């Protein structure tokens, strides 16, 4: 199974069911070349602030995701775990688009890579933004493998 193709097909069906969401779904999923770009676009749209624009955040996240080769596999395993274990999650695209637990975890994965590459200040920036936006506070030094589900996520704190 190619999860990216599956996600794109799901989103096309979702657009048929909810045409008013077409611009949103096109921007974040269908216009993206791959899963990494899509996740980075979603995170950038949520994490932007006065300190960093969404374009700059997307640029940072893409750079980090491409430098840490295991991140895409971890994200795929997280998405699959959500779909397989959360009865409310009917589509692979749902965690990417709508679940702040996944979005917080995806932000942590970027922060963790930054932390491991001695970019502690930027890692802490992303940790802080994830805490403010998603209610998920995961220390960038924490070790979390792929295939994790943080359901609902409000008030989750995971230390170093």
Language model features by range: what are they?
Residues 1-129:
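Terminal amphipathic alpha-helical/low-complexity segments used for targeting or macromolecular assembly
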Residues 131-160:
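Structural signal for interior beta-strand "rungs" in well-ordered beta-sheet cores
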